Structures are given as structure tokens and as C-alpha cells.
């Protein structure tokens, strides 16, 4: 079903790690049949949003984890909790065996077939082999993590597309430019180097930026940031929150 001209509140959080991205919706005054669809686990939700000047853009895709409806007169509010690739990452299992010297890319592609995502994007030259071959049985998610540890990549599911990048390296996509004239709100704030996440990942300090809604901002992609307080620089997006 396509919903238009309804009141919707959303909170979308995306990261570049292997945990499913999540988003929550509050949808107002739906018909009973439509409410039932939003209350059905594993149904797929596609969220589009945007300003009148740019039209609707894809913001998030997810499988319903839970849905419920609350009657608050005069409104009927349906709350929905979704996960991007949630069903695939939860359920997909693999039993695979590869001969010696099979390319890493081939092994990854075979694992991804078990996930039933829409696409796979490999943003770098994925190379390497196992000279003695490789066998795996278990969740497809665990298999990708094992290959990532061996061949130096990280992966995430973004809008039901599996995205691979070199560890701590942005994808090859064109960078989004964030400046006060392109939607930046206020000034960037520096992320403390001693933060637990940065220390664990051996990351350099980064920036936290607030801006107008921009669906083009995707974890793992490059972004160019420039403001009065910070000279132009290219950064890797590690987390995006659309609220």
C-alpha cells in the first residue's frame, strides 16, 4: 500500500556497522486494514521524505519488528518499529565450501545470495584468496564478518542494499557537500578522541554536524564539511539520524 497525505512522525538511525539500521514511525488515523499491515511482523516498510523543492527521496527501508495501535481521541496512532534487512540478517543461514584460491569477491557474493537483499555494492577492489580453501556453516551474517576480518572490509545494509567498504575507508561514491549554504545548521562539534567507540575502532577524532533533512547522507560514504570554524575537509559518515 502507498500512503500519502497522512501525518507521520519518524526517527531513523543508520550506522556503518553490521547491526541493522532501525527506524520508528508514528502514523496517524489509518484505516483498520492498513493498521493491520503495520502491525504484522516482517512486512516491509519503505519510507520516503523530502522538501517540496526536491520532492520525495528514499529515506529508509525496513522489515517490521513490532507494531501496535493506540487510541488517543481524536487520533488513532499506529507505532511501528522497523529494521533495515532485519529479517535477512536474523534468518539467513549458509552452508558453503570453496576450493583453494577462489577469489574473495566470489565467496562474498555467494554469501550475500543467502541474505535476499536487493543489491550488493562493493566500493573497492576486493581481492585475496584462501590457499587451502574455505568452508563455512552458520548465519550468513557471521560468515561475512569472518571474511571481513580476513580481507579487511566492513559491511552494512543500507536501504536493503549490502554495502562493502574497506575498513575505516569511505566508499567510492561522490561526496555530499555540507556547508551553511547547503543545509548545515549551526557549527560542527568535535567528537572527543577518548570516546569509547573511537578508541575501540582506532579512529581519529571526527565531527558531529546538524543539517536539514538530506537522504543522500549514507553511512560509509564520504562527506565534505566546511564552515567558518572548520576548513574544508573530507570525512567518512559513521552515523546518520533523521528525526
Cite the ranges covered by each PLM segment.
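Residues that flank catalytic or metal-binding motifs in active/ligand-binding sites
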Residues: 60, 160, 233
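Acidic, Ser/Thr- and Gly-enriched intrinsically disordered low-complexity segments
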Residues: 2-10, 62, 116-121, 158
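Amphipathic, non-transmembrane alpha-helical segments in extracytoplasmic/periplasmic proteins
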Residues: 19, 23-29, 41, 82, ...
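Surface-exposed cap/loop segments at beta↔alpha junctions
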Residues: 30-116
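Short beta-strand-centered interaction patches in the first periplasmic/extracellular domains
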Residues: 66, 75-87, 115-188
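Short, compositionally biased
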Residues: 61-70, 168-170, 236-243
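Juxtamembrane "anchor/assembly" segments of surface/extracellular structural proteins
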Residues: 1-40, 83-87, 175-243
Amino acid at each position: 500500500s502507498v500512503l500519502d497525505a497522512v501525518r507521520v512522525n519518524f526517527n531513523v538511525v543508520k550506522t556503518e556497522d553490521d547491526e541493522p539500521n532501525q527506524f520508528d514511525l508514528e502514523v496517524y488515523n489509518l484505516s483498520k486494514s492498513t493498521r493491520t499491515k503495520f502491525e504484522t511482523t516482517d512486512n516491509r516498510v519503505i519510507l520516503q521524505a523530502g522538501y517540496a523543492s526536491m520532492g520525495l527521496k528514499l529515506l529508509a527501508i525496513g522489515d517490521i519488528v513490532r507494531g501496535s495501535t493506540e487510541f488517543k481521541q481524536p487520533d488513532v496512532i499506529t507505532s511501528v518499529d522497523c529494521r533495515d534487512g532485519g529479517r535477512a540478517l536474523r534468518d539467513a543461514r549458509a552452508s558453503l565450501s570453496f576450493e583453494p584460491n577462489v577469489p574473495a569477491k566470489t565467496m562474498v557474493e555467494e554469501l550475500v545470495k543467502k541474505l535476499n537483499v536487493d543489491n550488493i555494492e562493493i566500493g573497492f577492489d576486493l581481492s585475496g584468496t584462501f590457499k587451502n580453501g574455505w568452508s563455512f556453516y552458520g548465519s550468513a551474517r557471521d560468515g561475512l564478518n569472518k571474511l571481513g576480518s580476513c580481507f579487511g572490509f566492513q559491511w552494512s545494509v543500507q536501504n536493503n542494499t549490502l554495502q562493502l567498504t574497506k575498513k575505516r575507508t569511505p566508499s567510492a561514491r561522490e561526496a555530499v557537500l555540507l556547508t551553511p549554504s547547503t543545509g548545515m545548521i549551526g557549527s560542527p562539534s568535535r567528537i572527543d578522541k577518548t570516546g569509547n567507540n573511537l578508541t575501540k575502532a582506532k579512529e581519529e577524532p571526527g565531527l558531529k554536524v546538524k543539517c536539514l533533512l538530506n537522504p543522500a547522507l549514507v553511512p560509509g560514504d564520504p562527506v565534505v564539511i566546511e564552515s567558518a570554524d572548520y576548513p574544508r575537509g573530507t570525512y567518512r559518515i559513521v552515523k546518520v539520524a533523521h528525526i
